[in-house]
């Protein structure tokens, strides 16, 4: 799998959302993945923005439409529209601020309340380059991820550590779910989903196929 540059040429379009407390680095994760850019002066996101990037998974081109919003309470009114149609999510906390991990449970509940049970969720511990300031152990989060059946990875948007891996893993897992559902339905996965259609991962009875905890910490 790898990067694919022609943005108008793709087989699948997946909506992925970033969620978590304000200031954990969601916007910089997005800009690092989509533009290979990092801003030291990144202010809290106002409202909602999204960016896109296409990658190759197997022999298919997967286009990600990645949405980013501020984690501040005053923006919670946009929740329903923000999550609608999402088939993947990166739930981000800051490894140097324990309160951001404490709030993960609330963000996870909100995410699950507004998305399908098959939505691929990656728990992301950002700012892993600041290991000397670490406030949350990798093991603590790994245990939580196993309990909640989510994926888990630690990243550094600043140093571009695991950012590519985190997004690519989420997109690959979504693709696997969609392909499996098409095959289970007796369809050819290459023709079951028209090009350009926003993908919905569907029913709630197939959760075990997706939610296998994994940890790729730095």
UniProtKB/Swiss-Prot annotation:
Q: Which residues bind GTP?
A: 20-27, 68-72, 126-129, 156-157
Motif Effector region: where in chain: 42-50
Does the keyword Amino-acid biosynthesis feature in the UniProt annotation?
no
Which Gene3D superfamilies has this protein been placed in? P-loop containing nucleotide triphosphate hydrolases
Q: How is this protein positioned relative to the membrane? A: Lipid-anchor
- Could you list this entry's UniProt keywords, alphabetically sorted: Cell membrane, GTP-binding, Lipoprotein, Membrane, Nucleotide-binding, Prenylation, Protein transport, Transport
Please cite one Gene Ontology biological process associated with this protein.
protein transport
Listed under GO cellular component are: plasma membrane
Entry keyword annotation includes GTP-binding: yes
| InterPro entries found in the cross-reference section | P-loop_NTPase (IPR027417), Rab_GTPases_membrane_traffic (IPR050209), Small_GTP-bd (IPR005225), Small_GTPase (IPR001806)
Q: Where in the cell is it found?
A: Cell membrane
SUPFAM superfamilies annotated for this entry? P-loop containing nucleoside triphosphate hydrolases
Q: Main role?
A: Intracellular vesicle trafficking and protein transport.
Q: Which family does it belong to?
A: Belongs to the small GTPase superfamily. Rab family.
Identification of the protein by name: Ras-related protein RABA1h
């Amino acid at each position: 799998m790898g990067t694919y540059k022609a943005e108008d040429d793709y087989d699948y379009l997946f909506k992925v959302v970033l969620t978590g407390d304000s200031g954990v680095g969601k916007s910089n994760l997005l800009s690092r993945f989509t533009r290979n850019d990092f801003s030291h002066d990144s202010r809290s996101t106002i409202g909602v923005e999204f960016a896109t990037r296409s990658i190759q998974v197997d022999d298919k081109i997967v286009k990600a439409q990645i949405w980013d919003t501020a984690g501040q309470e005053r923006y919670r009114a946009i929740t329903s529209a923000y999550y609608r149609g999402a088939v993947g999510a990166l739930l981000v906390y800051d490894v140097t601020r324990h309160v951001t991990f404490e709030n993960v449970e609330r963000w996870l509940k909100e995410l699950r309340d507004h998305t399908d049970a098959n939505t691929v969720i990656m728990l992301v511990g950002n700012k892993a380059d600041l290991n000397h300031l670490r406030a949350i152990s990798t093991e603590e989060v790994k245990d939580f991820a196993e309990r909640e059946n989510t994926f888990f990875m630690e990243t550094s948007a600043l140093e571009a550590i695991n950012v590519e891996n985190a997004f690519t893993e989420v997109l690959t897992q979504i693709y696997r779910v969609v392909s499996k559902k098409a095959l289970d339905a007796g369809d050819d996965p290459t023709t079951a989903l028209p090009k350009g259609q926003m993908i919905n991962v569907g029913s709630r009875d197939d959760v075990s196929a997706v939610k296998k905890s994994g940890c790729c910490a730095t």
